[in-house]
Swiss-Prot record:
Pfam families: Glycos_transf_N, Methyltransf_4
Keyword annotations from UniProtKB, A to Z: Methyltransferase, S-adenosyl-L-methionine, Transferase, tRNA processing
GO biological process terms held by the UniProt record: RNA (guanine-N7)-methylation; tRNA methylation
Species annotation: Fusobacterium nucleatum subsp. nucleatum (strain ATCC 25586 / DSM 15643 / BCRC 10681 / CIP 101130 / JCM 8532 / KCTC 2640 / LMG 13131 / VPI 4355)
Origin organism lineage: Bacteria, Fusobacteriati, Fusobacteriota, Fusobacteriia, Fusobacteriales
Spans annotated as tRNA (guanine-N(7)-)-methyltransferase: 439-640
Family: In the C-terminal section; belongs to the class I-like SAM-binding methyltransferase superfamily. TrmB family. In the N-terminal section; belongs to the glycosyltransferase 1 family.
Enzyme Commission (EC) number: 2.-.-.-, 2.1.1.33
Residues holding S-adenosyl-L-methionine: 470, 495, 544
Protein name: Bifunctional glycosyltransferase/methyltransferase
GO cellular component, one term: tRNA methyltransferase complex
GO molecular function annotations of the record: tRNA (guanine(46)-N7)-methyltransferase activity
EC supergroup of this enzyme: transferase
Gene name per UniProt: trmB
InterPro entries associated with the record: Glycos_transf_N, Glycos_transf_N_sf, Kdotransferase, SAM-dependent_MTases_sf, tRNA_(Gua-N-7)_MeTrfase_Trmb, tRNA_methyltr_TrmB_bact
Residues annotated as binding substrate: 578, 617-620
Length: 640
């Protein structure tokens, strides 16, 4: 019925189509999919640029954790261009236009690839796409599912059609409790629906250094003035913004309209208010005097960078009945956000912002000015904003971890795993090698995957916290306790033995510890997966002393040459050993190094001032139980 109605509608409408619409459809139906491979794919479908940005963290985590090809389909032109630009450097990510739910084109794609998972971002429910993927017995999920106030009444009228389609979807990860209730009321199976929170909370945006921000202010030619950014403004909001601006002193106003076709109207408003302005494009041509009151942005893609240097940040679509745009972008750059009363599109986020007092909701000029005065006079809310993102940053990661477990056929994957390690087929096996597959959220064993993490560990962990490495993590007793004590640091444990890796991962999973990753790597391979200045700490506990063949020890001059590259200035190396000669040799070695100094050492750790906070390794506990032997301990600082 759907396809018949679709065909009739297209046939009747085609003669009246404008050329722009014909081009839009032809572009999507004439795509060449010959470069798609007969390999496993995850297909992620986004409607527009908003969903492309929203799903970025999700895409990156699927890409890094699943090791599968990613196919991204996008409905709009701007969304497609944004996705192509975003993933142009990723060989295993392919971006296409969504083929407007054309059954033939969808099957052309499905017949070329081995689809493991279809991810529908927000509520992109296309009947042919869902039916054909379901026919192939591939899993379908909805991520960041949302049923808006406007859509819900329409959907209720179509419930008799929607129910069968919704029941073909394996799982719904919904934004809020109300969205969960609505999708269930429309026919989704209750047990397959979960409120996981809004994926927007899990955003990972571009970061700018202090030098970059200083240079950007110089480019904007704004001197020492404070910056008031009005982002994504809509018709009816600019008048209010201008009235507020006229009440401020020593500010430059930067207006970023949601749609650039409104620029002429905004220019007229500025002139009517007897204010001066320069267009962003004029700044690029060096035609600014540096004295203009306002910068009017006539370019796409610069709003986030502007938020990063702002003193006051307003998000549009909220002073008029639009429903609000992305309130999280200013917060990501640790800016207290101001918005209006119309937040129906971002209602959960708005409520959380107000609850935490990291933003202000205003209805008029007076309230707006008062909010600005409060921001200027009160202490920075960085700590609360950090807490806000920290608590919500794991939404995408948790979805990916769960789906990756479901996707993997353990027997087939295990066969590939054996080949990966031993390059042959064998019937006998180490049972713990196969158990690595049960902990993809913790354990990495593929060298290519680990190399991809180089310089990108902050993306993997979902934050920019300090990174510490433990060489020889054993069964994880030391590192899991260290991670529990230090939730604002990330930890990477290196271990070669399968059983130890599995036991370490089990300890972390049991305690829901998220800031740890385990790599099947040697300590000599640090530069394979760590970039320059990427770590702040290293722990080496009870390494083999290699008596008689000391050249094999891990702590030698070559380790410090590696630390010269991968460790930040003021970074720390912590070393424990029961071997007195090894202890003294390390002390002597550090004396010969210009870039390092010993800031603390003791030959009897358990009777020192460091004993109280010492975390005992498995070996340390066993050794203390069986022997009455002193434990040596050294703290080494990188001073250059």
């Amino acid at each position: 019925m759907y396809n018949l109605l679709r065909k009739i509608a297209l046939t009747l409408y085609r003669p009246f189509m404008k050329e722009k619409m014909k081009t839009f459809i032809n572009k999507r139906l004439s795509q060449d999919f010959s470069d798609l491979k007969d390999e496993e794919y995850i297909w992620i479908h986004c409607s527009s640029v908003g969903e492309v940005n929203l799903s970025e963290d999700l895409v990156k985590k699927f890409y890094s954790i699943s090791r599968k090809n990613i196919l991204i389909s996008v409905f709009t032109d701007t969304g497609y261009e944004n996705a192509v630009k975003k993933y142009s450097d990723k060989k295993k990510i392919k971006v296409i236009y969504f083929p407007v739910d054309d059954k033939k084109k969808i099957n052309e794609i499905l017949n070329k690839i081995k689809l493991k998972l279809l991810v529908l971002v927000e509520t992109e429910l296309w009947p042919n796409l869902i039916n054909e993927v379901n026919e192939k017995n591939s899993r379908i999920i909805v991520v960041n599912g949302r049923i808006s106030d406007r859509s819900y009444p329409r959907y209720k009228k179509l419930k008799f059609l929607l129910k069968s389609m919704l029941q073909k979807i394996a799982f719904f990860y919904m934004q809020s409790e109300i969205d969960k209730e609505r999708i269930v009321s429309l026919g989704a199976i209750k047990e397959k629906v979960e409120n996981v929170g809004n994926l927007k909370f899990s955003i990972s945006l571009e970061k700018y250094s202090d030098i970059e921000k200083k240079e950007y202010r110089k480019f904007l030619n704004i001197g020492d003035r404070k910056v008031f950014v009005a982002g994504s403004t809509r018709t009816g909001e600019d008048e209010i913004i201008l009235d507020v601006f006229k009440r401020l002193k020593n500010y430059v106003l930067i207006i970023v309209p949601r749609h650039l076709d409104r620029l002429p109207k905004i220019e007229n408003l500025i002139k009517e208010n007897n204010l001066t302005y320069v267009k962003y494009s004029d700044l690029e041509n060096n035609t600014s005097t540096g004295k203009e009151n306002i910068i009017l942005v006539d370019k796409m893609g610069v709003l986030r960078k502007l938020y990063s240097i702002s003193d006051i940040a307003f998000v549009g679509g909220t002073l008029v009945n639009i429903g609000g745009h992305n309130l999280l972008e200013p917060l990501f750059y640790r800016k207290t956000v101001i918005f209006g009363k119309y937040t129906q599109n971002v209602v959960d986020i708005a409520k959380e912002i107000l609850r935490r007092k990291i933003g202000f909701q205003v209805e008029n000029v007076e309230e707006f000015v008062k909010a600005i005065e409060t921001i200027e006079n009160e202490k920075n809310s960085d700590e609360e904003i950090n807490s806000f993102f920290e608590e919500n940053r794991l939404i995408a990661l948790n979805i990916v971890k769960k789906e990756n477990l479901i996707m993997n056929n353990i027997k087939e994957e295990a066969k590939d795993l054996w080949k990966h390690f031993f390059h042959s087929e064998k019937s006998n096996y180490n049972m713990y090698m196969y158990k690595l597959l049960d902990y993809p959220e913790y354990i990495m064993y593929d060298n290519d995957v680990m190399k991809e993490k180089k310089s990108k560990w902050s993306e993997y962990f979902g934050n920019s916290d300090q990174i510490a490495v433990e060489i020889g993590t054993g069964s994880g007793n030391f590192i899991y306790q260290l991670a529990e004590r230090n939730p604002n640091k990330n930890f990477i444990g290196l271990e070669l033995r399968f059983k130890r890796l599995v036991l370490a991962a089990q300890k972390c999973k049991k305690r829901n510890i998220k800031n740890v990753a385990f790599l099947r790597k040697r300590g000599e391979e640090l530069e394979d997966f760590l970039a320059n200045n990427e770590i702040s700490e290293m722990y080496i506990n009870f390494p083999d002393p290699w008596e008689g063949t000391e050249k094999n020890r891990i702590i030698q001059e070559r380790l410090f040459k590696t630390l010269d590259k991968i460790m930040k200035k003021d970074g720390m190396l912590y070393f424990k050993t029961d071997h007195d000669v090894y202890y003294n040799d390390v002390l002597e070695l550090v004396k010969t190094l210009d870039n390092y100094e010993v800031i603390y050492h003791t030959s009897d750790l358990h009777n020192s001032e460091k004993a109280e906070n010492n975390i005992k390794t498995e070996f340390e506990q066993l050794f203390l139980h069986k022997h009455n032997k002193n434990i040596n301990y050294i703290e080494i600082k990188k001073i250059v």
